[in-house]
Amino acid sequence: MAPITTSRVEFDEIPTVVGIFSAFGLVFTVSLFAWICCQRRSAKSNKTPPYKFVHVLKGVDIYPENLSSKKKFGGDDKSEAKRKAALPNLSLHLDLEKRDLNGNFPKTNPKAGSSSDLENVTPKLFPETEKEAVSPESLKSSTSLTSEEKQEKLGTLFLSLEYNFEKKAFVVNIKEAQGLPAMDEQSMTSDPYIKMTILPEKKHKVKTRVLRKTLDPVFDETFTFYGVPYPHIQELSLHFTVLSFDRFSRDDVIGEVLVPLSGIELSDGKMLMTREIIKRNAKKSSGRGELLVSLCYQSTTNTLTVVVLKARHLPKSDVSGLSDPYVKVNLYHAKKRISKKKTHVKKCTPNAVFNELFVFDIPCESLEEISVEFLVLDSERGSRNEVIGRLVLGATAEGSGGGHWKEICDFPRRQIAKWHMLCDG
């Protein structure tokens, strides 16, 4: 039998070919990865993030954002100083240097005081070369006042609006409020602050700082929203709520202002506005809405099962639109709260569906001293939530709440569901 012979040269060539192909594959993979990274970086630099937010407090940027702004050298600073010196002094209605410790102003002739500090509060990104346009329509109130509201003056809000086309930035400056009513009866003053919401999205809710013991607060705070297309501004509205801070209870609502942006032209420069603060309209609905709940008492385990099912016909909390409701459930024993639960928040709806179940342990077999409180609240990010309506079920509860509780006690181990009208919280 002849011996089998193989060529060693063929086996030596195989590793060489594999190595060459591996090297080419590695180079191709690295090149592809580098190209993808470059494409992502260039796309990210060219894309403007929508609704980026910057807050400026009296000319100081407390939420800085790097927007690839170039550094200014000595020559640029000098030229900018000369340009600002060449600008004429603008006559304004108040003098910031004449404020007292509470932020109040002396009663003087409005034409006598002048200051340029009030207008020069925008960031350096916005050169003040545009003309300031004051629209005659902006000096009118956003809502016609009734005879009752005219008798009860709630003050005036001063603000300015501006749009920067280069940065696609919408700038709102809350300047001051004058003539606010006193919410503290002892000191005859208020601790005011302002909340602002952009409608109809309600995604951006901002607020100013609290100014202590003043009825004429000067906030001078600038809120800048980046990535807002100019045509989109015509579809928006600004809702301002003027409140007085209360350390021990819910903040007092002084009033509100609604500024629709449709028809307002910001292409000519900054626009100054004054709006009368009107009373918050709480009579937008005939009632506070209804709540559907189901309860079951288990006598063998001394537990109470509570199911929050639905809510309907919930009123608007204010002119900012629909509420963001959720339900808070409190269990009381002898007028002492022993347990609490809450549902998830349902966004922008007057008819919410919850379908959430909670189980409470009852400390004793008798239900005479047990009561269940349902609070329907409007979720407000960054501030205290407002109570839309309230419902109480218990032995001493009035109306449908007492009847529902009696059925629960008479028929244990049975899930009993009923609709209830909500009352004021």
Swiss-Prot record:
A UniProt-annotated Pfam family? C2
Residues that bind Ca(2+) = D246, S249, D252
Q: Which GO terms describe its cellular component?
A: astrocyte projection; axon; dendrite; dense core granule; exocytic vesicle; glutamatergic synapse; Golgi apparatus; membrane
UniProt keyword annotation of Calcium present: yes
Where does it live in the cell?
Answer: Cytoplasmic vesicle, Secretory vesicle, Neuronal dense core vesicle membrane
Task: Tell me which parts of the chain lie in the Cytoplasmic compartment.
Answer: 38-425
One biological-process term from Gene Ontology? Answer: negative regulation of dense core granule exocytosis
Tell me which residues bear Phosphoserine: S135
Compositionally biased residues, Low complexity:
137-146
Posttranslational modification, per the record? Phosphorylation at Ser-135 by MAPK8/JNK1 reduces interaction with KIF1A and neuronal dense core vesicles mobility.
Q: How does it sit in the membrane?
A: Single-pass membrane protein
What is a single molecular function from GO for this protein? calcium ion binding
Q: What is its main location?
A: membrane
Polar residues bias locations = 105-119
User: Keywords of this protein's UniProt record, alphabetized?
Assistant: Calcium, Cytoplasmic vesicle, Differentiation, Membrane, Metal-binding, Phosphoprotein, Repeat, Transmembrane, Transmembrane helix
Protein name in the entry: Synaptotagmin-4
Q: Which organism is it from?
A: Rattus norvegicus
Lineage, please?
Answer: Eukaryota, Metazoa, Chordata, Craniata, Vertebrata
Query: Gene name on record?
Result: Syt4
